[in-house]
From Swiss-Prot:
Annotated localization: Cytoplasm; Cell inner membrane
Domain KH type-2, residue spans: 206-283
Source lineage: Bacteria, Pseudomonadati, Pseudomonadota, Gammaproteobacteria, Enterobacterales
Region of interest called G2, as start-end residue ranges on this chain: 41-45
Subunit architecture: Monomer.
Protein name listed in UniProt: GTPase Era
GO MF entries: GTP binding; GTPase activity; ribosomal small subunit binding; small ribosomal subunit rRNA binding
Residue ranges, annotated region (G4): 124-127
GO terms under cellular component: cytosol; plasma membrane
Matching HAMAP family: GTPase_Era
Pfam family, one: KH_2
Region (G5): 154-156
Species in which this protein is naturally found: Escherichia coli O157:H7
Domain called Era-type G: residue spans: 7-175
Residues binding GTP: 15-22, 62-66, 124-127
């Protein structure tokens, strides 16, 4: 009697902030797991997205963008999370943006050169490159930087060539037992996903200054008798002025954030959600490693 083979492995998605790593992960999984926003520092946790297709299970580690800037405790911890996820995977997807190449990209590349895992280079946002003639020389420049397993021009937004990446990933999964049941898409709890959804909406609806100094704590997450969930979210900011910004004129801003977050939660949890949000000032949390640990920023380091 023959036993069917199964394949399973970990894949890190790395790159500097804002190159489209989370969008790529969401496309590879076919749904939204990692929060996406146009602001740097959106992904703060190593979210694991799981894609199971028949005998193949790919477990994606979505790293925070690696930063040159290491001043604040939160940035140091984010860099540590990104670096540690490179070390223990079968394959790395290194995401860069179009024809842009920055010192941050160079820093990520140097970390990858030290690693043992093969690296796929995903050149994202190629549909946004104005001068198409610049693309080929840039790809040749990238190819000369490291012995990449493959170089794939993609658009994570539209899905262009994302299937190519998925096929390469499948080909490099080692023979192994699946780590998760096939219907799992993430190992994060619903409570964690709720806080991520609220944080995404904060980023989407607020100015550039705020995201660096805001976090979300879920104080209550319970099933109710209506077959849904009652969720209380506490939004922590560093200054009184930021609290006013989050609440908005006569509470308009926080109301919008709550409505949009509730829609996403209901879609993700497939159940009605009653959501209440509060805003509280907790100064200096982004500089305090103890506070960060209590908020779950180093739960996997």
């Amino acid at each position: 009697m023959s036993i069917d083979k199964s394949y399973c492995g970990f894949i890190a998605i790395v790159g500097r902030p804002n190159v489209g790593k989370s969008t790529l992960l969401n496309k590879l999984l076919g749904q939204k797991i990692s929060i996406t926003s146009r602001k740097a520092q959106t992904t703060r946790h190593r979210i694991v997205g799981i894609h199971t297709e028949g005998a193949y299970q790919a477990i994606y580690v979505d790293t925070p963008g690696l930063h040159m800037e290491e001043k604040r405790a939160i940035n140091r911890l984010m860099n540590k999370a990104a670096s540690s996820s490179i070390g223990d995977v079968e394959l790395v997807i290194f995401v860069v943006e179009g024809t842009r190449w920055t010192p941050d990209d160079e820093m990520v590349l140097n970390k990858l050169r030290e690693g043992k895992a093969p690296v796929i280079l995903a050149v994202n946002k190629v549909d946004n490159v104005q001068e198409k003639a610049d693309l080929l020389p840039h790809l040749q420049f990238l190819a000369s930087q490291m012995n990449f397993l493959d170089i794939v021009p993609i658009s994570a937004e539209t899905g262009l060539n994302v299937a190519t990446i998925a096929a390469i990933v499948r080909k490099h999964l080692p023979e192994a037992t699946h780590h998760f049941p096939e219907d799992y898409i993430t190992d994060r709890s619903q409570r964690f996903m709720a806080s991520e959804i609220i944080r995404e909406k904060l980023m989407r609806f607020l100015g550039a200054e705020l995201p660096y100094s805001v976090t979300v704590e879920i104080e209550r997450f319970v099933s109710n008798e209506r077959g849904g969930y009652d969720i209380n979210g506490l939004i922590l900011v560093e200054r009184e002025g930021q609290k006013k910004m989050v609440i908005g004129n006569k509470g308009a801003k926080i109301k919008t954030i709550g409505i949009e977050a509730r829609k996403d939660m209901q879609e993700m949890f497939e159940a009605p959600v009653h959501l209440e949000l509060w805003v509280k000032v907790k100064s200096g949390w982004a500089d305090d490693e103890r506070a960060l640990r209590s908020l779950g920023y180093v739960d996997d380091l």
